[in-house]
From Swiss-Prot:
InterPro entries: Rhodanese-like_dom (IPR001763), Rhodanese-like_dom_sf (IPR036873), Rhodanese_C (IPR022111), TrhO (IPR020936), TRHO_N (IPR040503)
Active-site residues per Swiss-Prot or TrEMBL entry: 354
Lineage: Eukaryota, Metazoa, Chordata, Craniata, Vertebrata
Entry-linked PROSITE patterns: RHODANESE_3
Keywords linked to the UniProt accession: Phosphoprotein
Domain Rhodanese: 300-395
SUPFAM superfamilies for the chain: Rhodanese/Cell cycle control phosphatase (SSF52821)
Phosphoserine modification, residue list: 268
Protein name: Thiosulfate sulfurtransferase/rhodanese-like domain-containing protein 2
CDD domains documented for this protein: RHOD_YceA (cd01518)
Amino acid sequence: MPSSTSPDEEDGLETCVLKVFDLDLKESNLVNPSNSLKAELDGSTKKKYSFAKKKAFALLVKTKQVPAPSYEFKGKRWRCCQQLFADQISIHRHVATQHAEDVYQQTASLLKQLTAALSASQSLTPTDKRSSPKDCLTPSQEVSAWLPDVSHVSPQELRSGQGDEEGEVLLYYCYCDLEDPHWVCAWQTALCHHLHLTGKIRIATEGINGTVGGSKVATRLYVEVMLSCPLFKDYLSEDDFKSSKGGSHCFPELRVGVFEEIVPMGISPSQVSYKKPGIHLSPGEFHKEIEKLLSQSSEEQGNTIILDCRNFYESKIGRFQGCLAPDIRKFSYFPSYVDKNLDIFRQKRVLMYCTGGIRCERGSAYLRAKGVCKEVFQLKGGIHKYLEEFPDGFYKGKLFVFDERFALAYNSSVVSECSYCGAPWDQYKLCSTPQCRQLVLTCSACQGQGFTACCVTCQDKGGKQASGPSQDSFKEECECTARRPRIPQEQQAQS
């Protein structure tokens, strides 16, 4: 079972937070400005450090400000981390203590902007100086210049998806070359705070990968800004944003960071590029391929593999009929899985799929680079887009998502079972042992009997802790996870 507290998991997307997911921003390869930032600067840039830090702090505080009804409060107020602040001292203290990392990120970005602006001003000709900055987005432009006007929207409309009221969760990615991911990081942080969005966003020189939740008004504004941004407008379309019912309550907070990869496969983008993926198939084309495959004889079916690129706990509760679903815990294990099982792909047509399409981009590129497959295809838009078009198609079960919802249901089929009694069941809960907190499938009847852990060891451990003195919770890998083969050896191509 995947741990909810492991900082190295990626897929990826939180009182019961799944910190193993795609967009988890606390893993060790996060590139962040640190307290040593000033010491690393050259002499001329170091002089601007204090100004940049103050401005970064002020900009972040400004994004937290919310209008106050005149009949209720005359001064300014700020909202952050589901708290309301009525005076500057308290919001300043909160930002300084709880969002220091964001301040450092934006400070580093502002320093780059100041340096670039100074360099540009010294080299511009009079003709250059007359050029409009709106023609092209450059690092010298302030983050605040790319925040949408929300004066026509009430604070209630922006925050309506935070409680029981229905909001929306967006899932998207965009592979494109970004020269200054730190600028994009600062901008995305400010943009999401501005629109009261929560979620997780990964940024790298190879692009951006995000999932954000908020009110429908806020998510629509977010899409509009992304589609109008010069960095992404030539690559993104409205169809690239997958939406589902939810809101900002689906995530405990906002996490935005700069990484080497926008989805961690564990291989540098310079070695395996998103620019050489498998052939994209629309949901309709993918549906026809599977329909044709399932109508063939067993011998003919052996020439094609439907490959699930997700983790085992995702495919466990939902998958395409006849697929090969690797029993791996992380996408970063996928390259090793391919290497270990290369023979099953030899001279085969491979139809790959994942949640939204992002893992297939580089996953298919890696498989193609091996040079053993006859053809490699991938589902454009992933399962998400397929289910929008074919809710009762060849995908059976639920779609796992990396937030507090755990899964989305598009059809009534149940393909998984209770870990204890074997009854049909597909509703994940977290292991009841605090140190473990892995995902477990245990039906209502078994939960009523006290079976709430991922395995017998955890069940016993949880019982002893409940009867003993309280102690601080600390992360601990479960024995059932430790016993799992890291990279399974497949005996046959089809399941």
